[in-house]
Amino acid sequence: MATSVGHRCLGLLHGVAPWRSSLHPCEITALSQSLQPLRKLPFRAFRTDARKIHTAPARTMFLLRPVPILLATGGGYAGYRQYEKYRERELEKLGLEIPPKLAGHWEVALYKSVPTRLLSRAWGRLNQVELPHWLRRPVYSLYIWTFGVNMKEAAVEDLHHYRNLSEFFRRKLKPQARPVCGLHSVISPSDGRILNFGQVKNCEVEQVKGVTYSLESFLGPRTCTEDLPFPPATSCDSFKNQLVTREGNELYHCVIYLAPGDYHCFHSPTDWTVSHRRHFPGSLMSVNPGMARWIKELFCHNERVVLTGDWKHGFFSLTAVGATNVGSIRIYFDQDLHTNSPRHSKGSYNDFSFVTHTNREGVPMRKGEHLGEFNLGSTIVLIFEAPKDFNFQLKTGQKIRFGEALGSL
């Protein structure tokens, strides 16, 4: 009887003649009981040839399938991350160095495809919007609480004084808040955290321990526009040697990360003369320590402004590196500099010389003098030559404030 019922059900679905008159009452009861569980399924009704047929759409099942897939993928990734953290903790207990895990080419390309420059320009315009007087205190208080801003150091502590976020980010400090150390030859140009420092051994400079960037890619090629006497470099070592202009000197570097809650202005780290500016339009990826450990040559990918010149021991450079929502880099004495502009294309650079017929020396800067500002947190990189007995007085990861000593002879 089950076979007979099955055939007649198939006939029903294919539009065979009325079935109630041809089925035995026992068969009708059996069919009704067999179809009872199907009534609980999500059926949809539609009309075909004037007959209403109930059928479960295939799309419903398709929509349900990604849910367990996403759950399994997310759970697997979370488990993998927990395993990595456990492994790092065990290596730390054993006193072993944790090797950095670098992003692959496709991961970097995917990150660079995000329109961070456009988003940063939008953020910059939002920062210029004047806030209502009643809204300023709650907005700024939230920012202060989130990033640990010390408003007692601000020249103006009244939050209602700052008309927009941009003014708040660029707030000035009280004169006594950052005393400049006069005993050391190089001071910190900004508040921040020391990511790395030391002597440049070869053409690869460490942005953080174990992760490097190319010295020539970062500073750009030496050209005649910089008014330097030596020819273009033909190799990595020759490029480094060109930066060291005096016999017996070595090349040094220091990387300082500015967090969003830090004082956003930067100052001259020593007495020197700025002769040249090179602007690299580029991406605006995050430069926080985690990203610096993940992306090789991160500083070479990002937009940056390289200031080069001379101090009493030879070559000296300060580079302001942009980041997400930090497309605006301002140099106070350079009115022609416009960063994160749509007319600038990635992969190029723009040179400007401060040495002219009327000014053969460039722009003299005194130690501690205001030099420029970011619109939010970012990174400062110092690369300079000094005698071999130059010593940094730093520890990797330490917090530092503008005016404190970096190193001396």
From Swiss-Prot:
Pfam families: PS_Dcarbxylase (PF02666). The keyword Transferase does not apply. Residues 1-52 form a transit peptide. It catalyses: a 1,2-diacyl-sn-glycero-3-phospho-L-serine + H(+) = a 1,2-diacyl-sn-glycero-3-phosphoethanolamine + CO2. One of its GO terms (cellular component) is mitochondrial inner membrane. The keyword Methyltransferase does not apply. Is synthesized initially as an inactive proenzyme. Formation of the active enzyme involves a self-maturation process in which the active site pyruvoyl group is generated from an internal serine residue via an autocatalytic post-translational modification. Two non-identical subunits are generated from the proenzyme in this reaction, and the pyruvate is formed at the N-terminus of the alpha chain, which is derived from the carboxyl end of the proenzyme. The chain crosses the membrane at residues 64-82. Residues 53-63 are mitochondrial matrix. It is an enzyme of class 4 (lyase). The modification Pyruvic acid (Ser) is found at S378. It is found in: Mitochondrion inner membrane; Lipid droplet. InterPro entries: PS_Dcarbxylase (IPR003817), PSD-B (IPR033177), PSD_type1_euk (IPR033661). Keywords: Cytoplasm, Decarboxylase, Lipid biosynthesis, Lipid droplet, Lipid metabolism, Lyase, Membrane, Mitochondrion, Mitochondrion inner membrane, Phospholipid biosynthesis, Phospholipid metabolism, Pyruvate, Transit peptide, Transmembrane, Transmembrane helix, Zymogen. Binds 1 pyruvoyl group covalently per subunit. Its cofactor is pyruvate. PANTHER family: PHOSPHATIDYLSERINE DECARBOXYLASE, PHOSPHATIDYLSERINE DECARBOXYLASE PROENZYME, MITOCHONDRIAL. Belongs to the phosphatidylserine decarboxylase family. PSD-B subfamily. Eukaryotic type I sub-subfamily. Catalyzes the formation of phosphatidylethanolamine (PtdEtn) from phosphatidylserine (PtdSer). Plays a central role in phospholipid metabolism and in the interorganelle trafficking of phosphatidylserine. May be involved in lipid droplet biogenesis at the endoplasmic reticulum membrane. Heterodimer of a large membrane-associated beta subunit and a small pyruvoyl-containing alpha subunit. This is Phosphatidylserine decarboxylase proenzyme, mitochondrial. It comes from Pongo abelii (Sumatran orangutan). The gene is PISD.
